[in-house]
Every structure is written in structure tokens, then in C-alpha cells.
Swiss-Prot record:
Function description: Binds the 23S rRNA.
Quaternary state and interactors: Part of the 50S ribosomal subunit.
Obligatory cofactor(s): Zn(2+)
Any Pfam family the entry gives: Ribosomal_L31
A GO term for molecular function: metal ion binding
Superkingdom of origin organism: Bacteria
UniProt keyword list: Metal-binding, Ribonucleoprotein, Ribosomal protein, RNA-binding, rRNA-binding, Zinc
Residues binding Zn(2+): 16, 18, 38, 41
GO BP, sorted A to Z: translation
Residues forming coiled coils: none
One CC-aspect GO term: ribonucleoprotein complex
UniProt KW Ribonucleoprotein keyword: yes
Name of the featured protein: Large ribosomal subunit protein bL31
């Protein structure tokens, strides 16, 4: 391998919005990374579904464009 062409590989602390924190290694130039979803709170891994209210968005779209 050539010397001096590879990025630095440092430890990064990842913090999720649910409060879960873990340490991994990355070429990211920052010591911390904030994410919205991790394996502790993602519906695929937890088996729980999150209800997303899209009915309001649909009604707003229909009113805006005159659809019934």
C-alpha cells in the first residue's frame, strides 16, 4: 500500500435520538455522530410498528388541488 493516501481511521461515538450510545470506528473527521434511528429503536429490529399519520397530508393535498 502507498503511504500517506489512506484516511485516518478513528473512534466515533454514535448517539441516537432514543438515547442509545455506542462507539465504532470511522473515517469521519468528527469525534461524535448523531443519528435519528439505530438498531435499538428501528421498527425492523424491535418488531414494533410506528404509526405515521399521513391522513392529514392527504387531505391537505386534496384541498389544495381540488380533488375529492
Amino acid at each position: 500500500m502507498k503511504a500517506g493516501i489512506h484516511p485516518d481511521y478513528n473512534e466515533v461515538t454514535v448517539t441516537c435520538s432514543c438515547g442509545n450510545t455506542f462507539v465504532t470506528r470511522s473515517t469521519l473527521g468528527k469525534p461524535a455522530l448523531h443519528v435519528e434511528v439505530c438498531a435499538s429503536c428501528h421498527p425492523f429490529y424491535t418488531g414494533k410498528q410506528k404509526i405515521v399519520d399521513t391522513a392529514g397530508r392527504v387531505e391537505k393535498f386534496r384541498q389544495r388541488y381540488g380533488m375529492k
